[in-house]
Amino acid sequence: MRKRPGRKPAFTRRQVIDATLAEGIGSFTLRAVAERLGVKATALYREFSSRQELQLAAISAIAADIEPDPQLCTWQDVLRDVVDRQWQMCVRYPEAAAVIVTRPEAFGVALPRITAIVERLAALGIPGGKEGAAFALDFAGDTALETYMSVQPYMTCDEEGRTGLDKFVRIAGELPELFGMQDMGERGNLDLKIEFIIAGMEHGLF
């Protein structure tokens, strides 16, 4: 559907994006977004031609959240910072991880910011130059997203107040604890996984 011409809407694109994020970047409906703004759903078409365009605009907006601290001066710290910011983004917008992983277009709209991070990692001397930087960032980013999605069921409470981890412990009983599930915390083993990636890059395994 083409964007509709006519009177200037009583809201901004950013307000529509913020309403979308509040509704849930994966599950939002145009009607629910419009209701948050106090307008009819058809009014949104003056700014966005489709739900898909709005969703991708929201992804593009939150991609800014992963930009690392400009004061960091080693590629290792930049990579850690990007992962930390990516995790915080997922906590802030719980549906974002699944959208990013399952929508190739989402990676596309975030690519300019991702490219800038790759160039910074390369400039700071990550082994392998830009290719090594792209590999490490992709590996670490995927690890953060997948860890977030896999940990959530263990942290979420059911109607009786039991978490998925509580249920796991009850079923596992006295079996050996090989994966650190009971002590994984809200980030799982993410930090250890990222240090593993960094160590691999430092040792020239790329």
Q: Residue locations for each model-derived region?
A:
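Amphipathic alpha-helical interaction segments
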Residues: 15, 81, 112, 116, ...
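Short, amphipathic alpha-helix enriched in basic
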Residues: 2-32, 36, 60
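Amphipathic alpha-helical packing segments from all-alpha helical-bundle domains
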Residues: 101-135, 145, 157, 161-171
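C-terminal peripheral helix-coil segments that are non-catalytic and often amphipathic
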Residues: 153-206
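Hydrophobic alpha-helical connector segments
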Residues: 67-112
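HTH DNA-binding helix-turn interface
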Residues: 23-25, 38-39, 45-55, 95
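Short, basic, alpha-helical segments at the C-terminal edge of helix-turn-helix-like DNA-binding modules
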Residues: 59-66
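Short alpha-helical scaffolding segments that buttress acidic/His motifs in well-ordered protein cores
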Residues: 58, 83-86, 100, 136-140, ...
